[in-house]
């Protein structure tokens, strides 16, 4: 029997979905991403959303100012779509290399999404412009109607929003972000080359029992919410198959400890410190390490039409404990898998 590999060497990966926040939080979390990833698609849902070219340029500079010396990292900026967004502004940002993609948040679907889109019809001229430009649309795929059960929001979104949109704009490039259900996995698998998906480590590693059985675990609470195990298994099967239109998107979403551990806690897992090793562990469990590099480093650039990174990253089989917390200006951050032992670590 062949001994398990002790080192995994892959092209430098990219994170195709990350929240870097702003202010002191940004300064704290950026290095965890910039150390490992060559590029990252940065979410625009700040308290004042990124809806203009100037705002994106200023935010990109704040991110770059927080990147430690020696880290080779490029933030890829996104535009927050609103009902009143100017299509000309979006096109200008895309042509000037400021906006890589635009993000569709259904209004009130997640953190800082109150400015989001009330209906796809309201932004159809913008989406038609994006289709012509070849500009990717990044979608938080959940309906937010009060009568829809939170565990059904993603499947309902496919039927009522995603499929009608893609039928109407057949050449629009769409990333179905952080998919969580067998419905979404099958939908993306059955789709054409204009449709891709990102998948988080938490949705591959855990299901709702892990969050709710034996006590509630607020640091596993994210949106879209963890689903039952049949959905988790469908996501695992998708990536283990070597499907090329699924790629790494951590959705790392930091909140201070007191905003997570409270009677009405915020959604989001701060997984940047341990995400790559977490993905490696999942692929190893599924005997799918042959597809690990493509998921992390090749599939995303292929969909976005970007070159792969030139550098390399090594992960070593070296059990390490994830810190219980990370210092923040007036509080602390509890990282994903805090206090737990992880099997794979990025070689420094």
UniProtKB/Swiss-Prot annotation:
Can you supply one Gene Ontology CC term for this chain's record? cytosol
In which pathway does this enzyme or protein participate? Pyrimidine metabolism; UMP biosynthesis via de novo pathway; (S)-dihydroorotate from bicarbonate: step 3/3
**Which positions are annotated as binding Zn(2+) 1?**
17, 19, 103, 251
Residue positions annotated to bind Zn(2+) 2 are 103, 140, 178
List the keywords (alphabetical). Answer: Hydrolase, Metal-binding, Pyrimidine biosynthesis, Zinc
Q: Which PROSITE patterns match?
A: DIHYDROOROTASE_1, DIHYDROOROTASE_2
Which cofactors does this protein require? Answer: Zn(2+)
Active-site residues per Swiss-Prot or TrEMBL entry: 251
* N6-carboxylysine: modified positions: 103
Cofactor binding note: Binds 2 Zn(2+) ions per subunit.
Q: Please provide the Gene Ontology terms (biological process) for this protein.
A: 'de novo' pyrimidine nucleobase biosynthetic process; 'de novo' UMP biosynthetic process
Question: Cross-referenced InterPro entries, in alphabetical order?
Answer: Amidohydro-rel (IPR006680), DHOdimr (IPR004721), Dihydroorotase_CS (IPR002195), Metal_Hydrolase (IPR032466)
GO MF terms here are: dihydroorotase activity; zinc ion binding
Q: What is its EC number?
A: 3.5.2.3
- Binding annotation for substrate: 19-21, 45, 140, 223, 255, 267
Q: Which reaction does it catalyse?
A: (S)-dihydroorotate + H2O = N-carbamoyl-L-aspartate + H(+)
Top-level taxon in the UniProt lineage: Bacteria
Function description: Catalyzes the reversible cyclization of carbamoyl aspartate to dihydroorotate.
Q: Which family does it belong to?
A: Belongs to the metallo-dependent hydrolases superfamily. DHOase family. Class II DHOase subfamily.
Quaternary structure (record): Homodimer.
The protein depicted here goes by the name: Dihydroorotase
The coding gene here is pyrC
